Amino acid sequence: QQRLKELGYYDGEVDGDFGGGTEEAVRLYQRQNGLDVDGIAAEKTFASLYSDNARQVTITPTPDPAQMPLLVNREHPVGADYEPDDLVKLKNVMPSSLVTVKGSDIEGDRTAANAMIEMFEAAKADGVTGWQISAGYRSYEYQQELFDEQVAEYRAEGFTQEKAVSATRNTVADPGASEHHTGLAFDITVAGTIFKGTEQQIWLHKHCWDYGFIIRYQEDKEDITGFLAECWHIRYVGLPHSTEMRDRNLCLEEYLGEA
């Protein structure tokens, strides 16, 4: 308890009683230090706690609860005039030593960007580097362009208009239905290679939840989200939403009771 308190994971009384508060503190420590999360201060966790590599607690700020988590999909679209309040150019705020921002015009929500910095710092501490942000905020107009381009490609292959639109919706959101409109969704990649199966993808899927992010489109949730799995697409929902969704194996629709 004393060591957990020193590192900021525990704020209760140091009394030697391993109760619920201590167990939750151990779980939080394990999550933020890359350990198996079981809430038990066994040998591996104990050794980590007293090592030089033990990290101080990282608390990611959560935006206004009235705004988070925001559900955006075909059933809950945003309007053509929707624009997030606090967008920043990621090139201006993301340290190049941690991550490459693919385009100079890529924007994102400021709080989400700060959470990403914390996440990539943790990844670097674990020896995982080479990250790239390929997409962030998209306007309604830009999403319309992407949607129309994909429909045109299918039409060129001989699809009917109806089938081209249906096929497009498996991988490209309708204008207004894309999470990228929020500024809270990002495509994380590795330059020059397929992301799936890389050490970066594996690390991201294990640890992003601890920094307020979720893997938004997963294989076992395709029937609920309406999208094919995208291992590169993360969405900021803030803590504790992200860890609750992970621990309960819920996608955003399920978590908000919309499934």
Model regions: which residues?
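Extracytoplasmic cell-surface/polysaccharide-interacting catalytic and binding patches
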Residues: 2-3, 7, 20-27, 31, ...
